[in-house]
Swiss-Prot record:
GO BP annotations listed: negative regulation of filamentous growth; negative regulation of transcription by RNA polymerase II; nuclear-transcribed mRNA catabolic process, non-stop decay; positive regulation of transcription by RNA polymerase II; protein destabilization
Coiled-coil residue spans: none
Key words of the record: Activator, ATP-binding, Kinase, Magnesium, Metal-binding, Nucleotide-binding, Nucleus, Repressor, Serine/threonine-protein kinase, Transcription, Transcription regulation, Transferase
Naturally occurring in which organism (per UniProt): Eremothecium gossypii (strain ATCC 10895 / CBS 109.51 / FGSC 9923 / NRRL Y-1056)
Biased composition (Polar residues): 48-57
Protein name: Serine/threonine-protein kinase SSN3
Subcellular location: Nucleus
Top-level class of the enzyme under EC nomenclature: transferase
């Protein structure tokens, strides 16, 4: 009986196995049929699309390579510099461009927000008690000033339109000395300095756009990365009509203006505390640059700005560059750096490579000029010849020798390694007269003279650096102490920066906006040349349209001249005037 049951079980297993094989085979067959149907459908779709579509383009159209539509779309959405800023006047011009004073234009949304905020401020009062609590009450529309906490446990009062306080609580707060008047928003209008880089050469506009100068690229890239209290802060950059506009914070004064104020019409020395505060802030900014591996290479009084609140800021980074991990010498990139009166002696002797010590020499020259109110080394610059070779600045070196004396191998061990070392033998021997110059200029502080000697050392290796200069006795003796406001304690005010309103060529940007490609629908002008090819089709390949237009105009002028000569020979109106090409 057991044997029979076992055989029946085996028969059942065999039957189940046969069923599984059958189902697997059927599943595979159905999968193959579905796959074949999908392939056939894809082939039919491909044939149908091929029959309905156009023939493939063998050669791409010129518009494929043109960036014109992209540029037009970007230009249409770009905000103009004159749409965002109101130009007040022209400040000055430099080697690389012009600088203008401007202020930001308020948008409609900002005006509505300011009005809403002003109304909210006039409608509430917050009084802070001595125990730190605060009680709020509404003020009636009677000219009362709103009160609020000033963040230090006191009460801040905003002046109302009427002018005075009628609230008894506000009067008591003022009598206790715990009330501070809130400044009006209109009294602190932020101003900006807009630097427009030059795009013309000798006043004549170039036919072909040459691109962005190396100086502009360096200044923009460095200003984007740097962030220090004693460096002018970059706000934004505009690229408009192939011109670059750098918008920076505005400073009302500079050291050149301050020196001129103290030296004209009569000489009045700068206050000792102001002098020390200016020098400390300059060295703090230079220290920040050098710690970030950046050389300024153009430090001078005109590039040292002072804001209305007495903060010194280093500006004009047009010649600045990084000196970390250099591939070639610094001389290879820029053969002439630093204004001649502030140029270090190693540069005058033809150094092919130099260090941050050149900036410290320039700081020493600025320090001496603030003391004596005139440049300490005022030499005459030798101009370059037609071969563009860098001349030896002998007159400037002589001015340095007359004050600091002739350097020796003891004071400057590596002086014989400089290319222009042999030029020193042509000068007379001078002795050190810096202390004589210092006392004759009105200097009395021995620590200041010691710092001046450290900054004006001949040997760049032993010349003091910015970090050590900040720890010098001149700053640490606190007699007088250094102030974050260089104008603190002064009984007089410096005149504001002179602004010229007659020279505002930046205003032409807005006048010619529709002609410069910033309009939403620029007209498509096509000029046919002699070969029958339009400029628009050639322009798609990147050819300058202005060059093509100039060539077409020249060809038309030649044809006109030829007809005038033929017709003029038969007429008796007078001699023929030849037109200049």
């Amino acid at each position: 009986m057991g044997i029979r049951l076992q055989s029946s079980d085996s028969m059942n297993n065999q039957h189940q196995t046969q069923q599984n094989k059958y189902f697997n085979v059927s599943n595979q067959a159905s999968t193959r049929s579905l796959w074949s149907q999908q392939q056939q459908q894809q082939l039919l779709d491909t044939k149908g699309s091929a029959s309905t579509s156009k023939s493939p383009m063998l050669m791409a159209n010129n518009n494929v390579f043109s960036i014109g539509p992209y540029r037009q779309r970007k230009d249409a959405g770009r905000v103009s510099v004159l749409e965002k800023y109101e130009i007040i006047g022209y400040i000055a011009a430099g080697t690389y461009g012009k600088v203008y004073k401007a202020k930001a234009k308020e948008t409609q949304e900002e005006q509505e927000n300011s009005i809403h905020t002003h109304n909210q401020t006039l409608g509430s009062v917050s009084v802070a008690g001595i125990d730190g609590g605060m009680a709020s009450r509404e003020v009636e529309n009677g000219g009362d000033d709103p009160l609020r906490l000033d963040g230090h446990g006191g009460i801040a009062v905003a002046p109302a339109a009427g002018g005075g306080l009628s609230s008894a609580a506000a009067h008591r707060a003022r009598s206790n000395g715990a009330v501070k008047a809130l400044p009006k928003k209109s009294a602190f209008t932020p101003f900006y300095a807009i630097k427009k880089f030059k795009t013309e050469r000798e006043g004549v506009e170039q036919l072909h756009y040459t691109g962005i100068s190396q100086s502009a690229c360096r200044e923009m890239s460095l200003c984007r990365e740097l962030d220090n209290k004693h460096l002018t802060k970059l706000v934004e950059i505009f690229l408009e009509r192939k011109s670059i506009y750098m918008v920076s914070e505005f400073a009302e004064h500079d050291l050149l203006q301050i020196i001129h104020f103290h030296s004209h019409p009569e000489k009045r020395l700068i206050a000792p505390r102001m002098l020390k505060s200016i020098m400390w802030q300059i060295l703090d900014g230079v220290s920040y640059l050098h710690q970030n591996w950046i050389l300024h290479r153009d430090l001078k009084p005109a590039n040292i700005m002072v804001t209305v609140d007495g903060c010194v800021k280093i500006g004009d980074l047009g010649l600045a560059r990084k000196f970390y991990n250099l591939v070639q010498t610094l001389y290879t990139g820029d053969k002439v750096v630093v204004t001649i009166w502030y140029r270090a002696p190693e540069l005058l002797l033809g150094a092919r490579h130099y260090s941050p010590a050149i900036d410290l020499w320039a700081v020493g020259c600025i320090f001496a000029e603030l003391i004596g109110l005139r440049p300490i080394f005022k030499g005459e610059e030798a101009k370059m010849d037609s071969k563009k070779s860098v001349p030896f600045q002998g007159n400037q070196l002589q001015r340095i020798l007359e004050v600091l004396g002739t350097p020796t191998h003891h004071t400057w061990p590596n002086i014989h390694k400089y290319p222009e070392y042999e030029q020193l033998s042509k000068f007379s021997k001078y002795r050190d007269n810096l202390s004589v110059w210092y006392h004759s200029s009105g200097g009395r502080d021995k620590a200041a003279l010691s710092l001046l000697y450290s900054l004006l050392k001949y040997d760049p290796i032993t010349r003091i650096d910015a970090i050590d200069a900040l720890e010098h006795e001149y700053f640490t003796n606190n007699d007088p102490p250094v102030s974050s406001d260089v104008f603190e304690g002064l009984s007089y005010k410096y005149p504001p920066r002179r602004i010229h309103t007659s020279d505002n060529d930046i205003m032409n940007v807005g006048a010619n906006k529709n002609k410069s490609g910033f309009n939403h629908h620029p007209p498509q002008q096509q000029t046919v040349n002699n070969n029958g090819v339009t400029n628009s089709s050639i322009g798609g390949l990147g050819v300058n349209r202005r060059i093509l237009a100039a060539a077409a105009a020249a060809a038309a002028a030649v044809q006109v001249n030829g007809t005038n000569i033929v017709s003029g020979s038969s007429s008796s109106n007078g001699p023929i005037r030849k037109k200049k090409r």
